[in-house]
Amino acid sequence: MPIKIQSDLPAKAELEEENIFVMDENRAISQNIRPLEIIVLNLMPIKQDTELQLLRGLSNTPLQIDVTFLQMSSHVSKNTSASHIKKFYQTFEEIKNNNYDGMIITGAPVEKLDFEEVNYWDELITVMEWSNKHVTSTIHICWGAQAGLYYHYGIKKELLPKKLSGVYKHRVMNRKEPLVRGFDDVFMAPHSRYTQASRQQILDNPRLKVLADSDEAGIYIVLGDGGKEIFVMGHPEYDRLTLDQEYKRDIDKGIEPDLPVNYYPDDDCNRKPLLSWRSHANNLYTNWLNYYVYQITPYDLNESYDNYCI
């Protein structure tokens, strides 16, 4: 899938080195195919890493995608330069009158705070409310999934006894849903979190459907209102070394973390980690874009979304 991005976005060069098809604005204009308009609310601290991870994941289906990155104006990033955010990110005020085919809300390292204690919570719920009328389908990742479940469905989050970190086995729970089409019966996916959405509250809500579950990591994928909202509790976008970097960062902070599960060969943190979830992640993004975005969204984004949202 070709992705249209700004010509000078830092991720562009690395994507091209990996033979991922990206195009700049000039080339995209010459094509007579409407791209899918995807907006990414990037709440992760090192935004360039998440940009690259998500763009990789979105690059594997045969449709052109136009990606817009969204920031929270009420939060000042400590790990990404203001110049990068100013150059490559839009504010909500700048995009609030637009419609989008799809939206991704990322995770954020704020799990131990109550939702209302997060300094951009009010702005985030404004964005989530706006998405009901302006976005065909939204996929929420990790803390973004917990926040979305809390806002849209009142699902509370719970503090885990210790950090859940590693790559865990999951099983498909509902084969009839297109989102899990092509998934193996048992597949691997990474997690890195201190909290979880209440399992019982999810199971008790008739508007929510569990599509993938894990004995060790808990509920993984939840479908809301037939696909209007999708909640992914882990981090399928993570690169091979992301958990490694987080683990060593925690050691440097004196946290004494447990070794990520099912990650290092022979549990040796000096060896190259195993990448066992890439095909699952690619399948997840492809199915979302195809079945919950492309086949649902109006060709003319100016049309009323009341007639098209799932």
From Swiss-Prot:
Gene3D superfamilies assigned: 3.40.50.880
InterPro entries referenced in this protein's UniProt entry, alphabetically: Class_I_gatase-like (IPR029062), HST_MetA (IPR005697), MetA_family (IPR033752)
Site (Important for substrate specificity): S192
Reaction equations catalysed: L-homoserine + acetyl-CoA = O-acetyl-L-homoserine + CoA
The UniProt record lists the keyword Amino-acid biosynthesis: yes
Residues at the catalytic site: C142, H235, E237
Enzyme Commission numbers on file: 2.3.1.31
Site (Important for acyl-CoA specificity): E111
UniProt keyword annotations, A-Z: Acyltransferase, Amino-acid biosynthesis, Cytoplasm, Methionine biosynthesis, Transferase
GO cellular component term of the entry, any: cytoplasm
Compartments where located: Cytoplasm
Similarity comment: family membership: Belongs to the MetA family.
The protein, known as: Homoserine O-acetyltransferase
